[in-house]
Structures are given as C-alpha cells and as structure tokens.
Amino acid sequence: KSPNSEIIIPLPGETEETYLKGIEFLMDHNVQVGTYTLMMLCGAELGRDMAINRFGMKAKWRILPKQFGNYRNRKTFEVERICIGTDTMSFENYLNCRNYSFVVKLLANQIFAPVYKLVKNLNISWYEFSRSLTKTIQDDKYSGKLKDLYNNFCTESFNELFDTKEEAVKFYSKEENYESLMNGDIGENLSAKYTAKSLLVLDEILTTIFYVIKEEFRNKLSEDQVAIVNSSEKWLKNLYMIDAIFGEEEIIHDNKYEIIMDFDFPSWVSKKDEPFQFFHKNSKYQLNYDIKKVKYMRNEIKSIYGQNKGYTSSDRAFGRYLMQYIGRGVDVFEKDFQKIN
C-alpha cells in the first residue's frame, strides 16, 4: 500500500504553480495525495484578523457534510468558514487546484495501482499522466463519463460556496434544498461522492485512462508496448465486479468465461520488479463471479447503508463504504480468476 499525504490549500504564500510542484513531487514518488481546503477556525492563527489582513485571505462559507438536522421543527446546520483565496492565490487558481484534486484523488484509489505500475514502467511520469488526463477531459471535443463527472464536480465545488453564513443557512432551509441535502444530492464530501460515482462506471473510466495513455503518449510507445497497454486494459476491464455488487440482477451460477491476452499482465503485476520482456507471451485466464462474495457484500452494504439508513442512491452508499472499508484492499471487488496457460 502506498503512503498517503495531505495538502491544505491555499496556505499563505501558496500559488497554483507551487501547489502543482508539490503534487508532482509526491505523485512521482508514489505518495497518494489528498487535498483539503483551509478552514479559518475561530481562535486559530489563520482565523484571526491579523493573519487574514496580512495574507489577503478571502473567505466563503459551506456546509459540513452530514452536519445538519431538524430539531423541534427547526432546521439546524453547521457551516464552516473556509479560505478560497489569498494575495498569492486567486479564487480562480483555488478552483483550478480544487478541481484537479479530484483527478488526483481518483487516481490514488488502489484500484488504479496497476495503472500506476504500468505507466511508471512505460517511463511516463504519473504526474504528467494525471495532467494529460485532466487536459483531455477538459477538452470540449472529448466526451465520456469521466468528463461528465469532472464537470459536475467543478459545478458543485463552485455552488457549495456562499458569501455569508446566513446566505448558506437560508439556502439550505428551503424545503426543496433541504430535501436535496437529505438525499445526498448536495452538501456531500465531493471527493468521496465523485470517486464513488467514477468507480460505479469503472469500465468507462478505464476507457478514458487508456485512451490518454495510447493517444497522448503514443510517441513514447513501441509496438510491443502498445500490445502491453491493450492487454492491460483488457484485463482490468474484466477483473472487477463492482457493477454486479451494486446491480439488482441475479448472478447466474455458471458464469465462467475466458480471455486471451498477448501480454500476461496479471502475472507481471503480481511481481515486484520484473521487466516486461519476461511476460510478453500469449496467456489465457478463466474468470467468474464469486457469488457468495457478491451476495455477502450486497447484504453488508444494504444493512449498513440501506435506504432506511438515509442512503437513497448506490453511489452515496458506495462512497461511504469506500471511505470506511477500503483498507481491506481492492481484492474484495475482484472476480475469481485462474491462469489456464
């Protein structure tokens, strides 16, 4: 498991450029990065007028995820004052960093650890890959689920901010907005929410990821390496069963199937530091859903995060599940597989 690090923005003196430099250093040293917005806490050094004036700190207000309720027929909310700009980082720069942090957070998920290993061994910087991925989904000419999710993240990261505490409370007190808050449509932890939404459409996310590898870095890839990339994509798109866990359809008992690859990606990934050349051969694998595992996880998620617990959508339930149980490892989401030859 890779080490984790946390970055707070915008600290005094931070710029968009220095933030990206920090992200580059950490990502290229296999450190998983989480980005958090600076809270201007009452009594803390950076919540006092002296620091606010000294560093030109600009504030907005947002609701804390799940910190609200209706008590004695009175809607109550906990909102926080956060910093969204300083004399060295504009509000626009802050949003650029905040929105890019979603891509960084998504790629930090252990499901994409094999992609990290692949990219590294193709002599592609993990940071540069993340920037190319971001540039691709920002391009008006590109379409896909990841682009849609990124755009929705950008919209929510802007709309969650209010100029005053009173403005935030007034907005969430409206019945239709309070209902959206209850349903998790607004006011959620955006990183967890959109990571979950992304993993629920994992095949389409992988399509975009491998599109970027093959298109944006094609000048770095040999013919053999293109075959390796294609085999990697094929394997990862067949490996996980997240769709089955959160689906309603009954899993049929006889669900075995086989895939053939030009490169033995599963064996290569399982080794620590073996070169590509030892695994560049035809390989066949048999995969199938572990029905007991699917049923167990369906029941577990339903019992903990079912609709009677306030989780009205699969992505919301999955987001909470990921945050609390990802330490078990991503193999809980994998199908059973065995090598045939």
Predicted regions and their residues:
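A structural motif corresponding to the C-terminal lobe/cap of the Radical SAM core domain
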Residues: 1-129, 133, 252, 258-286, ...
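Charge-dense, extended regions
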Residues: 174-341
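C-terminal non-catalytic alpha-helical accessory regions
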Residues: 95-205
